[in-house]
Amino acid sequence: MKLVVDGFGKSVAKRDNQIVIKENGKEINYYLAKDISQILLTGKGSITFDALTLLAENDVDCVSINWKGHVDYRLSAPDRKNAIVKKEQYFALTDSRSGYLAKAFVRAKIENQKAVLGTLAKSREEKDYIIEQREKVSEHIGKIEKLSNINSDNIRNNILGIEGQASHEYWSAFASVLDEKWEFFGRSGRGAKDPVNSLLNYGYAVIESEIWKSIYLAGLDPYCGFLHSERYGRASLVYDLIEEFRQQIVDKTVLSIVNRNQITPDDFEEDGNYIKIHERARRLLIAKILDKLNSKIMFHSKNISYSDIILYQGKLMADYLTNGVPYEGFSLRW
């Protein structure tokens, strides 16, 4: 179970083997620590040392996401000391395995972009432009496959160039299905200046915590990436693996709640150079993302949740690095 603690005046405490949630000092709920897989903190409040210790003892991640859609911190049990996996991960930076994985991440991302546009085209009468952009996006898959499996440092610029072209075409089609009132003209990344980008950023932050957990449990180093180059303090491997899941989990969810008017432009306000999501809209988005993570699809002939697929991909990456088990990025046809 993923537990969300939001709003103001909330506190998280411990009672025996339970996590207790309070509001303005009054107990409002409690849960057995062993039943919690992760806690998302999205409001203003506090957490006791005893609660943190109990969470760590039960291997429960505690993740704080601020209103800008940035992960402020992630608290977890001590790192799993899997030296063999990490050693192979570092060695892979100097050989063809790094290029193989970098290509796999981007190929899966582009395949999912193609899939999302296919879904959009099926549900709309005016779909010619979406189909046109989908075909352009699809062409980039072949370009990725043609790149040599060599050290990622030697092909990174080529991979990112192809990824950038595909993303430009994808976001152009994405924008075409949104009402003009949203003023969405393309993906802007961090520092969102419009409501849709702020929703995307927040949604990505929610699944980023899932990616961290997958990498941690697989014994991998989150700061040693293959597609995204190393930079001090940057969790490059987290940004690598999340590329496979943005479209199916977050992009589709944001499109759904916006186009169904479950969220309106009135649910946002300017705060300095940022667009701030009001609490009601933020709660709705988090609930929809968590519902998506818990929903199940057919994957390798099994009915499995998106959360478990994310865990599987981390383990598969570790198996590829240590045992040569082929790594295939996660993607769907639709």
UniProtKB/Swiss-Prot annotation:
Domain of life: Archaea
Matching Pfam families: Cas_Cas1
Annotated GO MF terms: DNA binding; endonuclease activity; metal ion binding
InterPro entries for this protein: Cas1, CRISPR-assoc_Cas1, CRISPR-assoc_Cas1_C, CRISPR-assoc_Cas1_N
One GO-annotated biological process of the protein: maintenance of CRISPR repeat elements
Gene3D superfamilies the UniProt entry points to: CRISPR-associated endonuclease Cas1, C-terminal domain, CRISPR-associated endonuclease Cas1, N-terminal domain
CDD domains: Cas1_I-II-III (cd09634)
Alphabetical keyword list: Antiviral defense, DNA-binding, Endonuclease, Hydrolase, Magnesium, Manganese, Metal-binding, Nuclease
Function of the molecule: CRISPR (clustered regularly interspaced short palindromic repeat), is an adaptive immune system that provides protection against mobile genetic elements (viruses, transposable elements and conjugative plasmids). CRISPR clusters contain spacers, sequences complementary to antecedent mobile elements, and target invading nucleic acids. CRISPR clusters are transcribed and processed into CRISPR RNA (crRNA). Acts as a dsDNA endonuclease. Involved in the integration of spacer DNA into the CRISPR cassette.
NCBIfam families named among the record's database cross-references: cas1
Protein name: CRISPR-associated protein Cas1 2
Species annotation: Methanobrevibacter ruminantium (strain ATCC 35063 / DSM 1093 / JCM 13430 / OCM 146 / M1) (Methanobacterium ruminantium)
Gene from which this protein is expressed: cas1-2
